[in-house]
Amino acid sequence: MELQARYDLCHALIQEAGALAQGYFNNLSSLTIKSKGLQDMVSEADLNTEVLIKSRIAAAFPQDAFLGEETGVTAFTQGQGIWVVDPIDGTQPFVSGMSNWCVSIAFVRDSVVQF
């Protein structure tokens, strides 16, 4: 039941975060983009989408750890569940106006991907 509740949250989050990211995608001309390094970038869409996902997960499952591409990892112990998030998987295509990007969310426990 506990895993099902996480799966249900994940499903809802993908829709909510996807809608937020799509709003930015539809308004690319006003999007702020920064370089994270050689051939690596982050946009305000990445950051804000990850913050949304992270806050919803923390509210529902405060005992779980979080690893986000943009915000990093929270404290994590062996056996603890961890959410692994790439808020906009495919930032380069996203900022280039190409539609081959997505919101990626996984939940891992005991080194096994649960979903």
Label every PLM stretch briefly.
Residues 1-88:
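N-terminal subdomain of lithium-sensitive/metallo-dependent phosphomonoesterases centered on the IMPase/IPPase/PAP
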Residues 77-115:
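DPxDG-like acidic metal-binding loop motif
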